Design a protein with these regions (language model features):
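Short hydrophobic alpha-helices and adjacent helix-cap/hinge residues
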Residues: 1-278
Length: 279
């Protein structure tokens, strides 16, 4: 099996000229022979393939991943499309943080200036409306990183931080992976929580998390079913079945959170075993 990976970088370049260049490249590379399967991941790539796929790759099955239910609502997906939805559970992580810090009165929500950050912060704000009588929310969205770090270093008491991706800041600076999150957790005067397992190890306490690895496996299984002869229209769009409570042991110690306060079945990463644990 030959797998070709195309990194579109639509987060940083999304103008019409750039998109046309991408389409021309795909036409040149994949018109003959056509691929047997296309797997776009995350909103920008999925939107591009759904819009232009029928012209570029007529009849080629599409299995998408990394998008929420709202993304596909009211979209005409076509008969050769199926996929795997991952609905981010913002309230699960917020409930967790409020339970572990019962004296919380303020929640600072952090997100970047790019399309991913803006989209997720909008969904997050909508999800958190039900909590507005319980705690005050401050939305730190699209700030230059230096300004964001200054605010996080001087948060009021009884605050927790809910971090969404900061892949681009308000000054136009781009960040790779968890680069910005590591800086956020290092300076924050309050514990930081998030909702994706790939964020564990950056200095966040933890969260009620979905797994990139499990999502990838699920998308791959759908793709294999199609390559083995099933038709996309016969495979229902699937939703992520489970979320996991996951924590960084080092941050539990940093913020004096007792392990017996964690939900049953929690996964604790980076735990340093004592001699009693080992023997």
């Amino acid at each position: 099996m030959v797998v070709n990976i195309e990194y579109l970088d639509l987060m940083h370049f999304d103008d019409e000229r750039y998109i046309q260049i991408l389409l021309d490249i795909f036409q040149y590379k994949y018109s003959k022979p056509k691929p047997d399967l296309i797997i776009p991941v995350f909103n920008s790539a999925v939107a591009l393939v759904l819009k232009h796929g029928p012209d570029l790759f007529p009849g080629v099955p599409i299995v998408f991943g990394g998008v929420e239910s709202k993304f596909v609502e009211n979209r005409s997906l076509g008969p050769n499309v199926t996929g795997y939805l991952t609905d981010n559970n913002y309230t699960g992580t917020l409930d967790l943080a409020l339970n572990l810090h019962p004296d919380t009165r303020h929640v600072a929500v952090v997100a970047g200036a790019g399309p991913i950050g803006r989209g997720w912060s909008k969904a997050c704000r909508e999800a958190f409306k039900a909590y507005e009588e319980r705690v005050d929310f401050t939305y730190l969205i699209g700030l230059p990183l230096e300004a964001l770090l200054e605010k996080l270093a001087n948060l009021s008491a009884h605050t927790v931080v809910f971090s969404l991706p900061v892949l681009q800041d308000g000054a136009g600076k781009n960040f790779i992976g968890n680069e910005s999150l590591s800086q956020i957790t290092r300076v924050s005067s309050a514990p930081v929580y998030s909702f994706r397992d790939v964020n564990i190890g950056t200095g966040i306490v933890g969260g009620y998390m979905s797994s990139f690895e499990e999502d990838g496996k699920a998308v791959a299984q759908l793709g294999l079913r199609i390559l083995n002869g099933e038709q996309p229209e016969d495979i229902p769009i699937t939703r992520a079945p489970t979320f996991l409570y996951m924590f960084d042991w080092r941050q539990l110690k940093r913020w004096s959170i007792a392990e017996d306060k964690l939900p049953q079945g929690s996964i604790i990463k980076f735990k340093q075993l004592t001699i009693w644990d080992m023997y």
